[in-house]
């Protein structure tokens, strides 16, 4: 078992996947605050590794996200973008790790009283969000600081995880990691 945080990649096989829809809904609540309304995300430049936002329709049905996990597999943070390919997602994580000092954290108020989350931006573009709601602003700030510290030195996995239905068993791997990465 690893003693350090890791960045894992999760691939979705359909844009209608309920886990993707849940992720989009949560992200929408996080970015509905001032972060999303005051700052206009820049359009990606040619060759840019930043993922597309899922609301712009530019991503494919086979898409994925990344998640920052603690050594005990607890989610510390997640990508703010949906990525069309595994290669783009992994390249963006490596690019972000090199620029952690440029990251700006903002706490946001959730959809109901007593819920708080956080969003991290680089150059006014949201790149990472909390993975859950917190009960207090101070807990939110502490969680964000911990996520940023972990992200700086997190191990970046070499392959994506294919999402499976809740309660279903993961099939034995019949294809290699390269083939799985290519399918996303």
What kind of feature is each model-predicted range?
Residues 84-101, 136-154:
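A short, charged, amphipathic alpha-helix used as a generic interaction element across diverse proteins
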Residues 91-92, 102-110, 117:
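Intrinsic, low-complexity N-terminal interaction/targeting segments
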Residues 2-6, 10, 150-184:
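Short, charged, intrinsically disordered terminal tails
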Residues 74-85, 126-139:
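A short, exposed loop/beta-hairpin motif centered on an aromatic-Gly-Thr core
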Residues 5-8, 19, 49-77, 109-127:
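Short aromatic-glycine-(Arg/Gly/Cys) micro-motifs in beta-strand/loop hairpins
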Residues 33, 57, 79, 131, ...:
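Alpha-helical membrane-protein topology signature
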């Amino acid at each position: 078992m690893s003693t350090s945080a890791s960045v894992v990649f999760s691939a979705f096989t359909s844009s209608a996947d309920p886990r993707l829809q849940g992720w989009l809904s949560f992200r929408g609540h996080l970015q509905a605050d001032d972060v999303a309304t005051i700052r206009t995300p820049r359009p990606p430049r040619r060759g840019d590794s930043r993922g597309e936002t899922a609301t712009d329709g530019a991503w494919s049905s086979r898409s994925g996200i990344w998640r920052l996990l603690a050594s005990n597999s607890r989610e510390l943070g997640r990508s703010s973008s949906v990525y069309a390919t595994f290669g783009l997602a992994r390249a963006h994580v490596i690019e972000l790790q090199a620029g952690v000092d440029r990251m700006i954290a903002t706490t946001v108020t959730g959809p109901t009283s007593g819920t708080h989350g956080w969003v991290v931006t680089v150059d006014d573009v949201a790149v990472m969000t909390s993975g859950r709601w917190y009960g207090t602003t101070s807990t939110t700030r502490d969680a964000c600081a911990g996520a940023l510290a972990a992200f700086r030195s997190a191990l970046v996995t070499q392959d994506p995880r294919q999402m499976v239905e809740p309660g279903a068993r993961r099939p034995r791997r019949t294809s290699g990691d390269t083939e799985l990465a290519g399918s996303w």
